[in-house]
Regions:
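Asp/Glu-centered strand-loop micro-motifs enriched in Gly/Pro and often flanked by an aromatic residue
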Residues: 32-42, 51, 67-74, 84
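Predominantly transmembrane beta-strands of Gram-negative outer membrane beta-barrel pores used
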Residues: 49-55, 62, 84-86, 177-178
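A subset of solvent-exposed loop/turn segments in beta-rich extracellular surface proteins, enriched
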Residues: 111-119, 124, 169-173, 204, ...
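Sec-dependent N-terminal signal peptides
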Residues: 4-14
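Outer membrane beta-barrel
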Residues: 59-152, 247-271
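Exposed, low-structure sequence patches enriched in small/polar residues
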Residues: 29-31, 38-47, 64, 78, ...
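Hydrophobic, small-residue-rich alpha-helical packing segments that form membrane-like cores
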Residues: 131-135, 147-200
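Transmembrane beta-strand segments of Gram-negative outer membrane beta-barrel proteins
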Residues: 19-37, 46, 54-63, 94, ...
Length: 499
């Protein structure tokens, strides 16, 4: 399959200038090093992802080739991981092959592709692109008054590596239909979905309402529920499977306000094809992003309220309040209050301050404080310097009461548009992180992660990045998708190109 796909696209190259357009991009990542306390410490591995596309009028063909090589036996692979043929004409779009599609707000099924992200599971030690697609077909029609989408495909279990058989990574067969009408900026829609795997077959429906009052407010609401003979279609008891999501947003010039609500119960479908909105703020700061609340789809409800205001002198204020409730054998409450303020003292300074307070009963962290500052200073010409400081204080009550301190310091210099260099230092006295598994003793005190990061854009199509040192892992969230990043000690080189 790989050879046939590459031969097909190579055959199109001579015709591309006359009959169409050929484009692509490539990501190459080399690592020399390993996880902490893991042998060998000088492990050598590399990962490569090549994406090629050909477009002629309404026809588009794409493929993705991935390979990974490591000294660890059994983790290497070389695969044609994606291919797609897409046809688009007027308001009709058809796809065959691998595709990323979402029905509604993702309460029932969501596909995604986190561009530039490389995923690795500790159990397999194999790196590959982080995406969840389907293999099958999709048809979509988007009219002025009516829209329609139908899909059928096998969903990818992206926690399993490409070194396994394809059948083992695509267990769920998803069949879905979404349709709706739009009148006077208001949309009413319906979703029907069936998910089948060797263990079960589930049926769901979903009602959609969305729209806006132009220039004033916009809203989005979805209610999803399973279809079963012994369960009423609107039941919300312990035996039911349902999800509810709603959002309101208001924007008026320099002021904006948004509100989100969620209520998910027994909404883990199949191997995890559903991925509803998290309704928690996705932080850009390291200590907060690692502490982000990850929704538990077996039972979770909550709200998020966020507002912003931009002053006449371009100062910017952001406020966010989040609350989530998990009802298991007892209630677990998550609360978070976040404030961020950006201002410009003088022509060359840009300063951002933030403060955060949270309680997380599921993690037994109460309270949890964080604060920090980012200072950008324009030196001369296109040169600037950056100082980034974060601090987090946590009280944790498990067997014993303990206090943790997490810190981040980043000192960097950059030249616009393509050069940046930074010294990164992180520290923590969290006992979950500091104990060395290769010794009989229980280590305490502080653990440190020093590192160097650099990036250079050689030209508009080629970028080279470098990391050397120790990198702290942990939870990370991007575009509403949360995953685990592994620790790393060594050297990492990335080269990205597009053509």
């Amino acid at each position: 399959m790989l050879k046939k796909g590459i031969i097909l696209l190579l055959a199109l190259i001579p015709m591309s200038e006359v009959y169409g357009q050929l484009s692509g991009n490539n990501l190459f990542e080399y690592q020399f090093g390993n996880l902490p306390y893991t042998d060998p410490s000088d492990l050598s591995s590399h990962y490569d992802q090549l994406n090629l596309g050909y477009r002629y009028k309404g026809l588009k063909a794409t493929l993705r080739y991935e390979h990974f090589f490591s000294q660890n036996e059994g983790s290497s692979y070389a695969n044609l991981s994606q291919f797609q043929v897409q046809y688009r004409r007027d308001k009709l779009e058809m796809k065959i092959g691998h595709f990323n599609e979402t029905l509604g707000n993702g309460l029932l099924v969501r596909g995604y592709d986190i561009s530039g992200s490389v995923f690795e599971e500790e159990a397999y030690r194999t790196r590959y692109g982080f995406y969840r697609d389907m293999l099958g077909f999709s048809v979509k029609y988007s009219g002025d008054l009516w829209y329609f989408q139908a899909l059928r495909g096998k969903s990818l279990v992206n926690t399993l590596p490409p070194s396994l058989e394809r059948e083992d990574r695509r267990i769920d067969l998803v069949e879905g239909l979404e349709t709706g009408i739009t009148l006077y900026y208001q949309t009413l829609g319906l979703i029907l979905m069936r998910n089948s795997n060797p263990f079960e077959k589930d049926y769901f429906y979903s009602l959609l309402f969305s729209g806006s009052i132009p220039g004033i407010i916009s809203y989005n609401f979805e209610y999803a529920h399973n279809l079963a003979d012994d369960v009423p279609v609107f039941a919300m008891d312990e035996m039911s499977r349902y999800g509810m999501y709603g959002s309101l947003s208001y924007n008026l010039g320099s002021f904006g306000l948004s509100f989100e609500y969620k209520n998910y119960h027994n909404l883990l479908i199949g191997t995890g094809i559903s991925d509803p909105p998290t309704t928690v703020r996705e932080h850009k700061y390291k200590v907060l992003n690692r502490s982000i609340h990850v929704p538990q789809l077996s039972d979770e409800s909550g709200i998020q309220l966020e507002g912003y205001y931009t002053f006449n002198n371009h100062e910017h204020l952001v406020f966010n309040y989040t609350r989530s409730l998990n009802q298991f054998w007892q209630d677990f409450v998550f609360n978070e209050v976040f404030i961020e303020y950006s201002f410009y003292p003088g022509k060359k300074n840009n300063i951002t301050l933030f403060a955060d307070y949270a309680t997380d009963q599921f993690k037994s962290e109460n309270p949890r404080y964080a604060t920090g500052a980012v200072w950008d200073y324009s030196v001369i010409g296109n040169w600037s310097t950056q100082l980034h400081i974060e601090y987090q204080y946590i009280e944790r009550d498990l067997v014993d009461h303990s206090t943790m301190h997490n810190g981040v310091v980043i000192v960097g210099v950059s030249k616009s548009p393509g050069l940046s260099m930074s010294l990164v230092w992180e520290m923590s006295n969290d006992p979950f992180l500091n104990d060395k598994p290769d010794t009989p003793d229980v280590e305490t005190g502080y653990r440190h992660w020093p590192g160097i990061e650099a990036s250079y854009r050689i030209n508009p199509t080629n970028t080279l990045s470098l990391f050397a040192g120790k990198r702290r892992g942990g939870p990370a969230c991007t575009s509403g998708i949360c995953y685990e990043v592994l620790d790393f000690e060594g050297v990492e080189i990335r080269f990205k190109t597009k053509f």
